[in-house]
């Protein structure tokens, strides 16, 4: 089985077999599987957060660009924003029990699966093109620099 292509930026991996939700500084990856989308935190979010200690996830209906939960790390507490509208049909209990699995491997550690309401969920805030990802992450890195 071939490994999915990815981009490496400053030691952080960004697999090209998924999409990235960038609204509200979300740093959420999406992996569509028919009308189900698995989502998780990307490598940048995991790196910036430091050790992730706790996840709180709401169950049930979610709306695009609205918070569906939060996570707490050694550095801050942050909201989790949904890239799509739909219904959370599965929560990854392994991540709730051991949140640091996201620090170890953010792309094998999905947080929730959402059954989407509308397959036409694409927006300017969901990117998948290699050049768009590079531009976005480099911009995010610059935002974190202290002058």
List each language-model region with its residue ranges.
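Non-catalytic terminal segments and appended small domains
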Residues: 1-58, 64, 77-78, 87-147
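Short beta-strand His + acidic residue motifs that chelate non-heme Fe in jelly-roll/DSBH
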Residues: 71, 78-80
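Elongated periplasmic alpha-helical coiled-coil
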Residues: 83-85
């Amino acid at each position: 089985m071939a490994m999915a292509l990815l981009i490496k930026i400053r030691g952080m991996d960004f697999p090209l077999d998924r999409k990235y939700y960038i609204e509200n500084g979300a740093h959420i990856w999406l992996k569509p599987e028919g009308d189900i989308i698995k989502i998780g935190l990307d490598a940048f979010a995991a790196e910036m957060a430091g050790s992730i200690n706790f996840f709180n996830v709401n169950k049930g209906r979610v709306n695009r660009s609205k918070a569906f939960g939060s996570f707490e790390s050694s550095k801050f507490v942050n909201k989790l924003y949904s890239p799509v509208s739909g219904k959370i049909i599965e929560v990854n209990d392994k991540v709730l029990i051991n949140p640091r699995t996201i620090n170890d491997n953010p792309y094998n550690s999905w947080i929730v699966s959402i059954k989407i309401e509308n397959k036409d969920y694409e927006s300017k805030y969901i990117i998948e093109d290699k050049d768009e990802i590079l531009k976005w992450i480099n911009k995010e890195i610059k935002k974190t620099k202290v002058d």
